[in-house]
Amino acid sequence: LGYIILKLNSMEKIRILGRHNLQLKGKVKISGAKNSVLPTIAASLLTEEKIQLKNVPLVKDVFTILTLMQELGAEYELDNDSLSIQVKRIRSEEASYELVRAMRASILVLGPLLARHGKAVVSLPGGCAIGSRPTDLHIHGLEKLGASVNLEHGYIKAEAKSLEGTIIEFEKKTVGGTENLVMTASLSHGETILKNCSLEPEVSDLCELLLKMGAKIEGIGEETIRIIGVKELGGASHNIIPDRIEASTFLIAGALTEGDIVLTHIKADHFDTIVEKLKFSGAKIDKLDDNSLRVIGSQEIKAQDITTSSYPGFPTDIQAPFTTLMTQAEGTSIITETIFDRRFSHVNELLRLGANIEILGDKAIVKGKSLLSGAEIIATDLRAAAALVLAGLVASGETVISGAGHLDRGYEKFEEKLNSLGADIKRLEE
């Protein structure tokens, strides 16, 4: 049933009735991390035994990777937020363009398929329309482990008789590359040392699952990770960490609307950077306990500059929602995007709502405060969609967003959660 509900067209529309003095108030439960569950699902390819995951968010990307996993030979059962998945044998080594195009994270099956099956054929990714995300770092690493990799007709074809441990230094930080190579090295011969690894909590979460499966990994959460390959991995149960990007989005919603929101089921130390920035802009944020925070927005939002960078820096996934917040701040902010090129698709749409923003290369110069008014706008990717929903909340009158289905890729019950806090958002039937 979940699959049917979530097989949504990304061109769906949502209507928001906003107002300048909207205050969001209440409690919201944060879901499991999308960017953690995708690699952990891919990791089930490394064993014949069953992997059980809890706190799984029911978002479209999860259903996309599960469809891909079924094609590769997986059987799964999904019950609310609990997923049981098993790949007794690999039925196909090909991840087709149709599915990889729908979600770039499908590249995460490349390493596990190769490590267990000796060959993998994975389409070059499509996914979000936000600039280039090179797969070269993944390919280079697999070659160093002894795989022969060719690019043919839009597919990455990798083969290896055996994979031998080695030292691999990533040219630049890569979350997917780190994840792919940690998984592959877990079933390689001997010792692999990965240098300049990504520090994201989602990478650590994957490593924690691999440990439970029997992998030998040292340096989890550090820039240098050491893996001693084992002959085989087994089944395991694992709780997915909370989604720090969803949590950050709701913190911004509270700050933006002079709201009073309590977030539960979180890991507060996973988004310290956002908390610091929001406090600087005037929000009051209190830690209630290890798993909950309260945000109280202030009447005056203070402008500030941000520069995106890899964890523990300011996350690129929160750049668009933060830009919306800065349209309501007094003064000028400079938002610099260093991770992805072309990640300013939300800006033209914010202009339609009345924002004052100028793009100069990798910078967006936001002049506030702008009184926003509702209009018809379009979202081209997941985080842009979230930013535009937030803008619609504080724009007077009706805002209709096309491309709202992008939200379903990464936010579980986004409108429902916002409506429970006092928003007025409705999905429109095409």
Regions picked out by a protein language model, each given a short descriptive name:
Residues G2-E430:
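Short, structured segments at the rim of ligand-binding sites
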